Amino acid sequence: MKVRASVKKLCRNCKIVKRNGVVRVICSAEPKHKQRQG
């Protein structure tokens, strides 16, 4: 899980999701692509 000021999709499998007011990126293909904004 990377914590970044701006989250971006890193591949075509990445999805941007907002959970409890926190923007996250989840990726089924590459777990290393998980990110959280903050």
UniProtKB/Swiss-Prot annotation:
Coiled coil: none annotated. GO terms for biological process: translation. It comes from the Bacteria. Keywords: Ribonucleoprotein, Ribosomal protein. GO terms for molecular function: structural constituent of ribosome. The keyword Ribonucleoprotein applies. GO terms for cellular component: cytoplasm; ribonucleoprotein complex; ribosome. The keyword Transmembrane helix does not apply. PROSITE patterns: RIBOSOMAL_L36 (PS00828). Belongs to the bacterial ribosomal protein bL36 family. NCBIfam families: rpmJ_bact (TIGR01022). This is Large ribosomal subunit protein bL36A. It comes from Pectobacterium atrosepticum (strain SCRI 1043 / ATCC BAA-672). The lineage of its organism: Bacteria, Pseudomonadati, Pseudomonadota, Gammaproteobacteria, Enterobacterales. The gene is rpmJ1.
